Structures are given as C-alpha cells and as structure tokens.
Amino acid sequence: MKKVFLMIATGLLLTTSCNQKVKVDEKIKVVDSETMEEITDMAAATGVNNTFVDIALPGPQGQTVRVRDYVGQNKLVLIDFWASWCGPCIRELPHVVKAYELYHGKGLEIVGVSLDKDKASWLAAIEQTGQKWPQMSDLKGWDCEGALFYGIQSIPANVLINEHGKIIARDLRGEDLINTIAQQLQ
C-alpha cells in the first residue's frame, strides 16, 4: 500500500510543474563556491521587496523586448515564465489570459518569457493560447538568461512588479493571481 501511495504521490508531484530535468550523463556542471555565491546573490536580489532585474531578449519577430520598457509605464508588470511543452503552463494560461483581459486597460502589462528551444512551437503556442502581450525568448530552454536571472527552477513561474520597479509577489496562480492584481490596482 505504501508503494502504491508513493507512486501516486510521485506522479502528482511530477505533473504539478515542469521542472528542469538534466540527465547526469548528458550534462554535468561543476559549480565552484564563487559561482554558487553569484547564483545565490542573484536569487536573493530578485525576491519580493527587491528592485526588478531587467531582461532583454528577442521577441517573436527578432526585435529586442525589454521588461524595463513596461515598468513605470504601467501600474503593474507581470513577467510570466512558461513554455509550449509545459502542460502545467498551458493549464495556467487561461488564468493569465483572464487577468490580462480584466486588467490590461487598468494598468496591467504582461511580458511572457518562454523557455522553449523551438521557435515554431513557441509561436504556435502564443497563438493557440491567446497570449496578446509582449513575448520574448532566446530559445535556450532552461539556459534562458531571464530564467537564470530570476532563479527559475520550475515553470509556470511569474514575478509581479509595481510601477516603481519593486517586486511585490512571485509565483501567483489561478484566482490568487487575479485577486492580487485586483488588490494592487485599487
């Protein structure tokens, strides 16, 4: 019985988020203490109550998209980390679309950061899921510069930034996302 429970629990855990998976024989990274300190510092720097870190990556047509171009011009900016191959991301996107539809005209902008590697899949998913907001991706998967800056280890993930550039929330889902945005825009 314990084995069955553990198998079910493991299955549920694996389906709740898309985690970075690296085969040991495929990719081994040795991280020295100095590099680990830099990673830790960056993760701490992008936590709640800190100033956002700008991301500048190619957009769908190759143009450079910068988060800083939206912060300050909007009351709130949501950086949404996702990928076309991530089932939980696709299931969460209707909530993000709903938030955009309800609050875009009231001061919300969303900037999507895709962890895709295939441009055609990325662009098709944008269209199929109704994402009308700015998008960016360097098509490097988990090595995406933006994901590294924000210490993203699983997706979907997001960062909510106020008009002053302060990170006010991270990893909001479903109704929590919509309710937090509503409260911040009052």
Give a label for each model feature.
Residues M1-D54:
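N-terminal targeting signals for export/organelle localization
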Residues T51, E101-D143, L148-I155:
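Conserved segment of the thioredoxin-like fold in thiol-based oxidoreductases
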Residues A56-V77:
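A short beta-strand-turn-helix
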Residues P58, G62, D118, L177-N179:
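Extracytoplasmic and endomembrane cell-envelope/extracellular-matrix remodeling and assembly machinery
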Residues L78-W82, S114:
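Structural cue for short, hydrophobic secondary-structure segments
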Residues F81-K98:
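Conserved redox-active cysteine motifs that mediate thiol-disulfide chemistry
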Residues G130-Q131, D138-Q184:
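Thiol/disulfide oxidoreductase modules built on the thioredoxin-like
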